[in-house]
Amino acid sequence: MPTKSFHRTDRVSAQVRRDLGTIVHAAVRDHGLPSVSVSDVEISRDLAHAKVFVTALQQERSAEAVKGLKEIAGQLRTQLARAMKLRHVPELHFHYDDSVDRGERIDNLLRDLDDVGPEATSSDEDAEQR
């Protein structure tokens, strides 16, 4: 019976994402930063570095949010160390996760195709066959 292997980095990533989500939520409020949420965390094999991917509720202020998080990364790491029982807490590197924006754009394009309807696409195909 095969079992799925779980690597330590996967478990630590999930825990960091949960704990950091709460910490970041409070920090953006305290520092007056645009509201963000932690969407994913990738941790290096040696657990020394963590890429923290965040999404901003206001896309136009995403650069400001990431810049602010990078400035307070040391404070966030200290709070994360208090919340987690790790000997070494990874260094935090914040990145904007644009996958939500790309997904929304694709969704809008698909919706626009639905608005065009099948009549327009069939007349286009008829014109191409001529």
UniProtKB/Swiss-Prot annotation:
GO cellular component: cytosol
Signal sequence segment: none
InterPro entries, per the entry: KH_dom-like_a/b (IPR015946), RbfA (IPR000238), RbfA_dom_sf (IPR023799), Ribosome-bd_factorA_CS (IPR020053)
GO biological process, one term: maturation of SSU-rRNA
Keywords: Cytoplasm, Ribosome biogenesis
Compartments, as annotated in UniProt: Cytoplasm
Sample GO molecular function, one term: ribosomal small subunit binding
SUPFAM superfamilies recorded: Ribosome-binding factor A, RbfA
First-listed, main subcellular location of the protein, grouped into a coarse class: cytoplasm
Domain of life of the source: Bacteria
Task of the protein: One of several proteins that assist in the late maturation steps of the functional core of the 30S ribosomal subunit. Associates with free 30S ribosomal subunits (but not with 30S subunits that are part of 70S ribosomes or polysomes). Required for efficient processing of 16S rRNA. May interact with the 5'-terminal helix region of 16S rRNA.
Alphabetical list of HAMAP family matching this protein: RbfA
Oligomeric form and interacting partners: Monomer. Binds 30S ribosomal subunits, but not 50S ribosomal subunits or 70S ribosomes.
Protein family: Belongs to the RbfA family.
Name of the protein described by the UniProt record: Ribosome-binding factor A
Native source species: Xanthomonas euvesicatoria pv. vesicatoria (strain 85-10)
